[in-house]
Every structure is written in C-alpha cells, then in structure tokens.
Design a protein with these regions (language model features):
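Short, flexible loop/hinge motifs at secondary-structure junctions
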Residues: 1-141, 182, 212, 257-321, ...
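Catalytic center-proximal scaffold of phosphoryl-transfer enzymes
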Residues: 9, 121-123, 131-528
C-alpha cells in the first residue's frame, strides 16, 4: 500500500510538470501566431505555490531577551514652552495653584527661507579683474543646502518619485523643475560616492563575516544586478552588469586592480573546477612568480587556447582560480574570512569559508506539496524536527561550548540521515546533509547569524525603490543611487538621523563624524 501511495505522489508530480510544459508550449505557439501567452498573475502564482515563509516557525523558537523600553517622550525635543492659563473668573475662592500638567504636542513648520545675496562687487582697472563677495559655504547654484537636503532625503529615505518631490516643494513655495531635482540627485556635489567607498572599506575590517545577496535592476533598459553586502554596522549596494565570481571579487577589492596568482591554492581550485591535468601542467610552465596583470593573464589564456571560441568556460575558471588566490594573498584590503549567503554558485570558493542561510534552505521544504495524506503528515513531522534543531542552534549562540557543538553536530547527522519513504522529501534531506559544513559553521563561529535576512531585507529596499523609479538612465545616476542607498541604510544601522547627516554633508559643515568613523568606533567598542 505504501509503495502504491508513493507511486500516486510521483504520478501527480509528473502530471503537474506536464501541465506546466503544455502551457509553455501553448504560449510559444500563440507567440508564433502573433498572439499573447497566458498572463502571469502574481497573486495567483503565490496562491498556487503556497506560503514558503518560515516566519511563524522561527518566531516560536527565538531566544527572547529583555525588551528595551521605548519611552517616546524622552526622545522628543521640546523647542518652546507655552503656558496655558486658567480663566480666573471661573475659579472658586478655595482654588489653590498646584503647578503645571505638561502635554507635549509635536508640530512641524514648512516655510520658505529664500535669501537674496547682495554680493559686493569691485573692479580693478590695473588688474582688469572683478572681485565679488564670497557666498556662504555650502551655497552653490540657485538652491540652498536645505532644499538639496530635503530633495535627497525625500528621494532616498522617503522613496518619493521626482515628480512628487517637485509637487511637494511647489506646494511649500519652492519653484523647482523635475530636471533640476534630477541634477541634484545625480551630480553628487557632496561626494557621497566617496563616502560609500569609505563605509565599505571600514566595514570590511569590522567583522570576520559579511552577508551578501543580489537582485536584478534595470540600467537604461538593460538587466544589471545589485550586489548587496552587509553586517550589523553597514549595508552597501553595488550595481554591476554581471553576477559571477570575478564581479564579486572586484567588489571586495574596493576598486583595486585585479591581479592573478597561481600558487598551491590556485591549483587546488583548478582541480575542483575540473580543469584537465594537461592544462594545469601548461599553466605551471607559463605562470609568473609574484602574480600576473590582466594583460599577462589574457596572453596566457591565448597561449592555452589559440582558438578564441574554444574553452570559454575553462578560461573563466582559470581566471577565477588565479584571481581568488591573488585576493587571499594581498594585504592592501581587509580580507573577508566568511561569506554568509544563499547557495548561489558565484558566492562559493571566494573566502576561507562559506556559511549558508538556514531559512533559505528551509524554503525548499515548504515548497514540497504532497497530495497523499501520509506524506503530508511525514513532511510536517520532519519540518517540526527541522525547526526545533534551528531553535537549538539559536540557544547555542547564547552560550557556546565545544561539548554543545559536538552534541549538535551529532544531532544534525541523525536528523538529516532520515529516510522517510517520501521520495521528494528524502532527496531534499540528502541535499541538506551535504551542506553540513556550511550550515553548521556557526558551531565554530557563534557570532554568525543563522540566516541571511539582513541582506534579503536590503534587496527588498532596492525592489521598493524600483516600484517608484523603474531604472536609472546613466552611469552617473546609477553610482549616485548606490551611494545614497548605502549611506541611508548604513545610517539606520548606526542610529544616525539621515536628514541631519545629509544636511551636515551638503552644507559642507562636517560637524558630524563620518559613517565610516562610526563603524570603526562601534567595532572597537565591541572588541574591548
């Protein structure tokens, strides 16, 4: 009977696959006939796939600490005090003054402060030169630092579109065009791009691990990728045309020129990448001691593969092996020891170790959709064991010991060697068991998060931005977008008021410490 039930499950799975293939073929035929295929309706798709979120399971097993008090009144700045007097005519004769009962009412004023600067003007006939009085620092063009700060904050913190920003400012008495708003957002007069570079460089030294994720973006109609790096102190965004290992390495090099080194580690990688022993032998003969430049690397590849169209994938793997080895040996940029990510191939082999996200792995179990009641029960029972083990790992992080690590490692082996008889589930369990080293890396490094939610939430910020602004048009606009997103999201993590911070930078006052300095300060405080 059990075998028959599993056969029913397999037939249902095959039937669903055939339905999907049949619909794809129908869509292809319709397109050839000049008609449209079946529309993709997001709500219907999600309903059919089911909820793959594990939020409720995780919430049940979180280690709850003491809740921080959120006294609202303590955080409110009082700008002025006004006494509200009692009408003495209504008071009885025995009424006695007992002080004041305070009530804080928050208010905001939106008003213009348009200034006409009368610049003194002198002319020297002998020098044939005109001398003008200097404008205040931070004043450039026809809009002051306050207006520019508000434009940048509304766009990148409030996620408002440029037409709506123009409408809002117009209602407030500021006459400004959408093209001027666009120039303010893209010209980056305050050099927030440099600020982003400083943030990333400081952040690389702040923790041994970094989280990474990516999402698609559009640049002038072309598909690009936003690579997102983060840890508890920062979030940085990098829009790039590709999402391969070399691209990730270039980001980690912080603008430093990529070089190639073929040492023992590089040759180990070449073997893992299934490069033939013949090619490896040739590389040993052609490699240069002390590293190779990009030009020298391309010359070596031309020697290995004289026919340009041949060995395209092998060329890429050879470049990756040499670039990774060179990155590990360089000392100019802080090395990332551990990358926490999903299971995407471009994040593998780059660092000394890789940690994987438990929640991402758990989604695969939530996507299983058995129809046989027995298999439904088997799946639910296993998922309970899965998330109970996740809860054990959370508890381990609060008080790690070698003994507890050994117990959890053995428990992982027991859970993920289970044979349930439900074929799809057993296949999924086997795949998880092969990721043991990456999933249990926190047993050696308890500071590691169990999930990659921080990077995924940052990717969601990028997607919410696209809801308002579908794409950037130019390289300058793309770089400005990345810089502002990095500054805004990093300021949130550091508890910095982004409006005040942007105002400080745009006005050129520089009274506030940079975000890069704050990252270093917080890191040093944690290590004391």
């Amino acid at each position: 009977v059990f075998t028959l039930l599993q056969l029913v499950e397999c037939l249902n799975k095959d039937n669903e696959a055939l339905k999907k293939e049949n619909q794809n073929l129908r869509d292809a035929i319709n397109l050839l006939k000049g008609e449209q295929g079946k529309p993709t309706i997001p709500g219907k798709t999600k309903e059919k796939q089911g909820n793959v979120s594990s939020g409720e399971e995780i919430k049940k097993r979180e280690v709850k600490g003491k809740r921080k008090s959120k006294a609202k009144k303590d955080k409110i700045k009082v700008d002025r005090t006004q006494i509200c007097k009692v009408d003495k005519s209504i008071l009885p004769e025995d009424a006695v003054f007992k002080g004041y009962e305070p009530i804080i009412v928050q208010e905001i004023l939106i008003t213009t402060d348009n200034v006409e600067y009368s610049r003194e003007k002198y002319y020297s006939p002998s020098q044939k030169k005109t001398y003008l009085g200097e404008l205040p620092i931070g004043v450039k063009g026809e809009f002051g630092p306050g207006t520019k700060t508000l434009v940048c904050t509304l766009k990148h913190s409030g996620n408002m579109s440029e037409p709506k920003i123009a409408e809002f400012l117009g209602n407030g008495g500021i006459s400004i065009s959408q093209s001027t708003i666009s120039r303010i957002l893209t010209n980056d007069e305050s050099d927030f791009a440099k600020e982003k570079d400083d943030i990333f460089l400081a952040a690389l030294a702040s923790t041994p691990y970094h989280q990474v994720d990516d999402t698609t973006v559009k640049v002038n109609g072309e598909t690009h990728y936003s690579q997102i790096f983060c840890n508890p102190f920062y979030t940085a965004f990098f829009t790039v045309p590709h999402k391969d290992r070399l691209t990730i390495l270039d980001i980690l090099l912080c603008g430093k020129e990529r070089t190639y080194l073929f040492d023992s580690h590089a040759f180990d990688l070449l073997s893992e990448f299934n490069i033939s022993q013949k090619i490896i032998g040739q590389i040993m003969q052609l490699k240069k001691e002390g590293g190779m430049s990009e030009e020298e690397m391309q010359e070596m590849l031309d020697t290995l593969y004289p026919k340009r169209k041949k060995g395209k994938n092998n060329k890429k793997r050879i470049m990756e092996a040499g670039a990774i080895a060179a990155y590990r040996q360089q000392t100019d940029i802080p090395l990332v020891d551990i990358l926490l990510s999903d299971d995407a191939p471009q994040f593998k082999k780059l660092t000394e170790a890789q940690a994987l996200c438990w929640i991402h792995d758990g989604r695969h179990y939530n996507r299983l959709n058995p129809i046989v009641p027995l298999n439904v029960k088997i799946l639910n029972t296993f998922k309970t064991s899965y998330w109970d083990f996740y809860g054990d790992l959370l508890k381990y992080k609060t008080s790690p010991t070698p003994e507890k690590a050994d117990i959890l490692s053995a428990k992982f082996d027991r859970i993920f060697s289970t044979k349930t008889g439900y074929e799809d589930l057993d296949d999924r369990i086997e795949k998880t068991s092969k990721k043991k080293e990456a999933l249990l890396l926190l047993l050696k490094h308890p500071e590691l998060p169990l999930h990659n939610n921080a990077a995924e939430l940052a990717a969601r910020v990028e997607k919410r931005r696209q809801d308002v602004s579908l794409q950037t048009k130019s390289k300058q606009g793309t770089e400005a977008k990345d810089a502002f997103l990095t500054v805004v999201e990093t300021a949130k993590k550091l508890g910095v008021n982004i409006y005040k911070y942007m105002a400080d930078r745009i006005s050129k006052k520089f009274n506030l410490p940079s975000l890069a300095e704050l990252i270093t300060q917080k890191f040093l405080l944690q290590t004391e």
